């Protein structure tokens, strides 16, 4: 922890617009504390500082810079293996240290402290400039963002230090030294703060033209990316899901995680009631917002498979659509765009080129189902692991020779994965653009020792047709809420019809048959454990490459067998038929200590009460 709270030394201006300038950082003049709440402009700028440390996940290659996380490349979904300096690679080898791992602990306490100061002082703002509606709404936003930053830290570090009051700027001794707060108390605090923020935002807009479930409108512009009542309820569910899951619900592997006075920081007894709290939170959200404020994003087409593809693709790249609950607008997505665009050597200059080194792991490719809704391990699925067929993907203009592993897969596969010799989405000019990942191909190893895919696949999901211009990154969307509800309900009331109902809503949107007993259904799982596996599988596919899988595997305590598994892909050192051989890309390891990130060692040395996570 820092020994001081700096109230304000400089502002970071935020232009809250529906475009890409939402979190543009513009240094302003140094202002005194009295100046901050004297005008609406300065008050907005100070609130903007709370939002500023939200992660720019388009910069995940450079994590932890820009507060981006290494989560996609550090999960079993994908990798940046060809780039030795990328943070996810040290996680994948468990060679990282508490310097890199502690970055978010330091960076996210900054907005926590700013939010606390804002909450304590906003009521004294100049009434002539900042009316009561704005005061209460902004206070609710700051309170919710403080809770969300705590949640983001909790899913990395476990028990954190809850600072509900300001730390004196010139404090000493026990005024600035703190022990970690037991995890269940962290959960109760965050839930309580989100409930309070929900109430404040709701009350603030009464008798106004604003709506609590919509972002504020300022100067006739909707300020997307701001906290709403829906955001409060959705993150309440997220923290309760984390608390109910095996990682923090009776996890005896953390029995030795205690404060210096012996206080147990993670409960050692399983509590089924935590799942009930998650179920109730999910119901609260769905009853208030589902079908009104939010709905599953869907597009149409004469071909139902193409409609499914368009729906599953554009729910991610169509900013602020009906499914988005919370996200961050960005002025550029160039880093990520470069990561998922092939090298394409030899094409004219009007063809946009990248590297394509955010590589999909073969295990992720294999997880996608077939078009008929069966897994590739099912003998009735029609899957073939060898040979070629003339096949037209849902985004292609014609049929072309395609490796049979990639033929007739579910629509979400074509949303998520760019494979060898597939039709490139962003065409230019009259020459057809086709990426070739074989060794001698236009995007193969011969072109670069590191600036190409390591597995013969590239992540495709965030690929937009607008290049790398301003776009939003969605943190949380309705499909995840559906799956959260199904998961929690299966732990509380196995066999409840709502469980597969909400799973099936997502599957049908993806063009797949649902689980059931009808002629067109997939046979439904019948036990709690098999339903649990179905839900986890659906989360893996639906939420792929959205920074969800990394945290799921940890909270389920199965990261050692998944994130620690070796990575396979195609043979990127071969051409022709030899390319299509499943080949070991590299070995991974995941140690027990990696379930929790390390607290920065400097903070341990400064704070006499602060204890480190096990194994660090």
Model-found features: residue ranges?
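Long, intrinsically disordered, low-complexity segments
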Residues: 19, 108-111, 189-191, 220-223, ...
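An aromatic- and glycine-enriched ligand-binding surface/loop that stacks and positions planar moieties
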Residues: 20-84, 139, 160, 164, ...
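Conserved, well-structured interaction surfaces
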Residues: 39, 44-62, 80-158, 173-219, ...
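TPR-repeat structural position
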Residues: 187, 275, 495-496
């Amino acid at each position: 922890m820092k020994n001081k709270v700096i109230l304000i030394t400089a502002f970071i201006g935020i232009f809250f617009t529906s475009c890409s300038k939402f979190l543009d950082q513009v240094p302003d003049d140094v202002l005194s504390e009295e100046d901050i709440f004297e005008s609406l402009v300065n008050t907005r700028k100070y609130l903007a500082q709370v939002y500023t440390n939200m992660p720019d996940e388009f910069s995940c290659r450079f994590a932890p810079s820009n507060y981006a996380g290494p989560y996609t490349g550090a999960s079993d979904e994908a990798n940046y293996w060809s780039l030795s300096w990328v943070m996810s690679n040290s996680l994948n080898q468990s060679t990282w240290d508490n310097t890199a791992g502690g970055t978010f602990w330091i960076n996210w306490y900054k907005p926590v402290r700013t939010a606390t100061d804002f909450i304590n002082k906003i009521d004294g703002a100049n009434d002539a400039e900042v009316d009561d509606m704005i005061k209460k709404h902004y206070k609710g936003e700051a309170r919710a963002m403080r809770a969300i930053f705590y949640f983001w830290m909790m899913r990395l570090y476990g028990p954190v230090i809850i600072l509900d009051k300001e730390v004196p700027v010139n404090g000493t001794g026990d005024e600035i030294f703190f022990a970690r707060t037991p995890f269940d108390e962290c959960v109760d605090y965050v839930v309580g703060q989100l409930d309070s923020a929900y109430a404040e935002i709701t009350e603030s807009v009464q008798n106004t033209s604003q709506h609590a479930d919509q972002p504020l409108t300022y100067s006739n512009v909707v300020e997307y990316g701001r906290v709403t009542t829906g955001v409060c309820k959705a993150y309440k569910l997220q923290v309760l899901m984390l608390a109910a899951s095996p990682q923090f619900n009776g996890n005896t592997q953390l029995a030795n995680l205690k404060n210096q006075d012996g206080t147990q920081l993670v409960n050692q007894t399983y509590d089924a009631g935590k799942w009930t709290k998650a179920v109730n939170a999910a119901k609260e959200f769905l009853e208030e917002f589902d079908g009104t404020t939010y709905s599953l994003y869907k597009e149409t087409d004469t071909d139902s498979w193409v409609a499914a593809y368009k729906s599953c693709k554009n729910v991610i790249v169509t900013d602020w659509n009906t499914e988005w609950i919370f996200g961050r607008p960005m002025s550029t997505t160039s880093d990520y765009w470069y990561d998922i665009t092939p090298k394409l050597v030899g094409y004219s200059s009007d063809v946009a080129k990248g590297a394509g080194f955010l590589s999909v792991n073969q295990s992720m490719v294999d997880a996608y189902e077939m078009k008929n809704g069966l897994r590739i391990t099912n003998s009735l699925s029609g899957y073939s692991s060898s040979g070629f067929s003339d096949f037209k993907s849902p985004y292609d203009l014609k049929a072309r020779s395609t490796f049979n592993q990639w033929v007739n897969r579910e629509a979400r596969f074509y949303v998520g994965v760019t494979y060898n010799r597939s039709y490139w989405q962003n065409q230019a000019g009259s020459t057809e653009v086709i990426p070739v990942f074989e060794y001698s191909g236009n995007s193969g190893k011969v072109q670069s020792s590191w600036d190409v895919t390591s597995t013969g696949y590239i992540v495709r999901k965030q690929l937009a047709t607008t290049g790398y211009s301003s776009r939003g990154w969605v943190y949380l969307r309705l499909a995840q809420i559906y799956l959260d509800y199904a998961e929690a309900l299966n732990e509380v009331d196995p066999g409840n019809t709502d469980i597969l109902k909400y799973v099936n809503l997502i599957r049908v949107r993806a063009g797949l048959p649902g689980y059931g007993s009808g002629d067109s259904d997939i046979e439904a799982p019948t036990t709690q454990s098999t339903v649990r596996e179905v839900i986890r599988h659906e989360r893996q596919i639906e939420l792929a490459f959205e920074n969800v899988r990394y945290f799921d595997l940890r909270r389920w305590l199965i990261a050692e067998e998944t994130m620690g598994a070796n990575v396979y892909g195609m043979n990127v050192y071969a051409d022709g038929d030899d390319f299509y051989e499943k080949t070991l890309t590299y070995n991974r390891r995941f140690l027990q200590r990696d379930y929790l990130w390390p607290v920065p060692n400097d903070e341990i040395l400064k704070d006499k009460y602060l204890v480190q996570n096990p194994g660090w």
